[in-house]
Amino acid sequence: MATTYEEFAAKLDRLDAEFAKKMEEQNKRFFADKPDEATLSPEMKEHYEKFEKMIQEHTDKFNKKMREHSEHFKAKFAELLEQQKNAQFPGK
């Protein structure tokens, strides 16, 4: 079965969105058991805030990298389709 560029791109976009959603859900679960801020010392509160920020930055960076890879795969797939078309229909 031949796959069109649109099908391939849509699948990658869907997978990227699913992955980003799963990462966000995982982060929410990870921080769900955070102690009540009222019980934390200022140092521990600062520690939690820094840690949450770091986790979010890494998640954002990872999601961005996944999107970049998807764009690269889309470009390569388009190249392969073009090569295949040129091989099947030379001169067109």
From Swiss-Prot:
GO cellular component, one term: cytoskeleton
UniProt entry keywords in alphabetical sequence: Cytoplasm, Cytoskeleton, Microtubule
Record's keyword annotation contains Cytoplasm: yes
Subcellular localization, as worded in the UniProt entry: Cytoplasm, Cytoskeleton
A Pfam short name: KMP11
Main location as per UniProt: cytoplasm
InterPro entries reported in the protein's UniProt record: KMP11 (IPR004132)
Disulfide bonds: none
Domain of life assignment: Eukaryota
GO BP term (any one): defense response
Keyword Transmembrane helix: no
Protein role: May be involved in the regulation of the cytoskeleton through interaction with the subpellicular microtubules. May be involved in parasite mobility and attachment to the surface of the host cell. Behaves as a strong immunogen during infection.
Family: Belongs to the KMP-11 family.
Additional comment: There are four copies of the KMP-11 gene in T.b.brucei.
Assembly: Monomer.
Designated name of the protein: Kinetoplastid membrane protein 11
Species the sequence originates in: Trypanosoma brucei brucei
